[in-house]
Amino acid sequence: MSSSPFFVPRAPYAEDPAKSRGRRFPEDESRTRTPFARDRDRIIHTSAFRRLKEKTQVFVAHEGDNFRTRLTHSLEVAQVARSLATALGLDSDLAETIALGHDIGHPPFGHAGEDELQACMKAFGGFDHNVQTFRVVTELERRYPDFDGLNLTWETLEGIIKHNGPVTEKLGKPSWKAISKYDAEYKLGLNTWASAEAQVAALADDIAYNNHDVDDGVEAGLFTLDELMDVPLIGPILAAVRSERPDLDLRLTRLEAVRRMIGAMVDDVMGETLKRAAATGVQSAEDVRNLDHALVAFSADMAEDLARLRQFLHTRMYRHWKVNRTRSQARRILAEMFGLFLAEPDVLPSEWFARSQNRDEAGRARVVCDYIAGMTDRFAIEEHRKLFQLDVWN
């Protein structure tokens, strides 16, 4: 056994890549990478992953270059997930892979884009970014000669669709039809929890976006450090930073407070997860799946503090008038493009026009939705300009 202070023995309930349930389409194994590491590399090399660099979280891309995008967010989630998985003795490759892939189905313009595509697709089966992520990795990415999608391992697919918990209650929704169809052929155990690694990815997502939305919100001038002083978790940490380091300017004070808050949340997840593992006596990955609650979790106190922080962010950031203004503009762009493409599919690019042929209206709508969902913010703005502004002819 290693004497390194950073060595953590493998947990008995960690996923073992040597015992993976495999891929839908059999492939020879790599001599240099585990199956989960191969999945990670396949996700990184997709065009969908690259396009995340110009898809926004809250702010539309043209609002500024310092704000986080889906790509930077995914990288931050992956870093937290890998570190947390390593500290808990889990498979860090699998946790990192699920974290990197969890957002690649998001459309342009953040949640405003998802809301608008859901509205556009209401009569045609709906839209859900989690389902779209699954469709990207199982169908829409076309990089290999023998199959569509990425042919990821069972464990990665399970984690992508179930990282937030069992999804059986969602299967009746029209937007989840693709998941139900896939599950009928390749059972994903949708009524159980996912692996501990997938649960780590979900908590890493919470840790990353809560902290970094605080950072971006102050950077954007939507609220100040003083206004955070009464908010649970961040308030006491901010007070401690100001007391211990009065020499720091506002920027370094903010960054130090965010750094400490990330550390506090990671420590809380580690403590709560180890406590739950001891209480439940889990001894295998299947034991984790068969629990009636999550294994990886925040403590009750931390969960309460986070709920109040999210409420602050919802009021002061996500529904700020500046953000609402860009949301309105973004929704109009997508709605107008969707209507035109559905009515006149021959204005779609050749590849997408070909996909729309020999389909009923619902099928054509899905192709249009897939095309729009894959756009970046900047591309959507430019495409809309070309389609609707006559001055582009001048």
UniProtKB/Swiss-Prot annotation:
Biased segments, Basic and acidic residues type: 16-34
Biological process (GO), any one: dGTP catabolic process
NCBIfam families on file: dGTP_triPase, HDIG, PRK01286.1-1, PRK01286.1-3
SUPFAM superfamilies referenced in this protein's UniProt entry, alphabetically: HD-domain/PDEase-like
Gene3D superfamilies in the record: Hypothetical protein af1432
InterPro entries for this protein: dGTPase, dGTPase-like, dNTPase_2, HD/PDEase_dom, HD_domain, HDIG_dom, PHydrolase_assoc_dom
UniProt GO molecular function: dGTPase activity
Alphabetical keyword list: Hydrolase
Region entry Disordered, spans: 1-34
Alphabetical list of CDD domains matching this protein: HDc
Entry keyword annotation includes Cytoplasm: no
Organism this protein belongs to: Caulobacter sp. (strain K31)
SMART domains (alphabetical): HDc (SM00471)
Highest taxon of source: Bacteria
Residue ranges of every copy of the HD domain listed in the record: 70-210
Family of this protein: Belongs to the dGTPase family. Type 2 subfamily.
Protein name listed in UniProt: Deoxyguanosinetriphosphate triphosphohydrolase-like protein
